[in-house]
Amino acid sequence: MAKHPEPARHEVPAVDEAALAAARTADKLLECARQRGSQRWAEFLAPVPDLLRDAGVGELRAVAMRARAAYGPRDSIRDALPAELTGPFLDDLDRLRKVLARELAER
């Protein structure tokens, strides 16, 4: 059974838009973590915005899952950074995951 080649991001505008929205929110969250001196979360978040901007369609699910791991039951980014940033980032990540799932289902 032949595997279909991965589409380029620009060929899947809904995925690209969702990933870019999450990247913009991640930038804000990263800046906030740095301003507050939250080294743990600044280090965790540092690669996330660029990964969300640059990862291929096939890699984005793993990037979103890794970023979503910041919302753990014991150690959560919500405990260190403001809800007005952590809430929208979680929403953006979930939206990206849904768009990716829809794209994969259609293939």
At which residue positions do the language-model features occur?
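Intrinsic-disorder/low-complexity coil detector
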Residues: 4-6, 12, 48, 72, ...
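Amphipathic alpha-helical binding modules
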Residues: 68-107
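Short terminal alpha-helical segments
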Residues: 1-46, 93-107
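Amphipathic alpha-helical interaction modules
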Residues: 30-77
